[in-house]
Amino acid sequence: MWSKLSISSKINRIRDPESDNTIEDTHVARVMRKYYMDKIGTLPEWLRPPGWQPPVNTGPTSPVSINASNAAPSNLKASYIPANPRRLSSSTSSASSPPLRRLPSVQHSTFDDLFEGVGSLQKSPSTTKPLSSTPSGSLLRSKFDHTRKKF
């Protein structure tokens, strides 16, 4: 009994400094603070920790231009450049498919807007038919019904 108690008290004293030890300083709160500081330069009132002071504004900031001759790979951010789908596929069926439509980027002012934006993109009108109305769907439905009747 005493050995378990002493072990648990030692474990409680050894804590990761990055662990979630207070309500105001959880991992999620730290990540969200970093996000808002990077995006808008300040924190929303509901996310501010006790005693937080807003950063002093020294004037408008401008993006730093990097000269291509002295740019180091560590200074540049990686970006995703989609490949041309026609070069990826050698079949002729991809040429008849409509070109991919790129959705406009959405600027979110709050964390809730971020989720509302995702929901509105997913609720776009669909042109798909129910499974049973397509030829392959009706074939699947008939096979399913046929197998179900056997048992």
UniProtKB/Swiss-Prot annotation:
Residues 55-77 have a biased composition (Polar residues). Residues 48-151 are annotated as: Disordered. One of its GO terms (cellular component) is cell division site. GO terms for biological process: vesicle docking involved in exocytosis. It holds the Pfam family Mso1_Sec1_bdg. InterPro entries: Mso1_N_dom. Residues 85-105, 123-141 have a biased composition (Low complexity). This is Uncharacterized protein C1F5.05c. It comes from Schizosaccharomyces pombe (strain 972 / ATCC 24843) (Fission yeast).
